[in-house]
Amino acid sequence: MKIIKNATAGTVESSDIMITVQPIESTENTIELESSVEKQFGNQIRQVITTTLEHLDVQGVAVKAIDKGALDCTIKARMITVLHRGAEKETYDWKELDSWNV
């Protein structure tokens, strides 16, 4: 999936995460995380973000996440949404997404 524009999903309310993506001039992805629970769960949050990027074959994107205690399922849902918005895709491959739940 190719990200072609900046996009945002989520909120900064309690138990949520706001994720912003923007295309960059690189094949590498960058992740900037701001979280009140970063010391405890920062690695796990980054892992969920990275795994979602890999599943959707996204390269060359800068991800900024402002976490307020979101669960993994919320992070994954916000990532899927923001990436589809950034790629201007209006449909989801539900079978593909469901195959992640092994």
UniProtKB/Swiss-Prot annotation:
Keywords: Cytoplasm, Phosphoprotein. It is found in: Cytoplasm. One of its GO terms (cellular component) is cytoplasm. The modification O-(phosphoribosyl dephospho-coenzyme A)serine is found at S14. Its main location: cytoplasm. InterPro entries: CitD, Mal_deCO2ase/Cit_lyase_ACP. It comes from the Bacteria. Transmembrane segments: none annotated. Oligomer with a subunit composition of (alpha,beta,gamma)6. Covalent carrier of the coenzyme of citrate lyase. NCBIfam families: citD, PRK13253.1. Belongs to the CitD family. This is Citrate lyase acyl carrier protein. It comes from Enterococcus faecalis (strain ATCC 700802 / V583). The gene is citD.
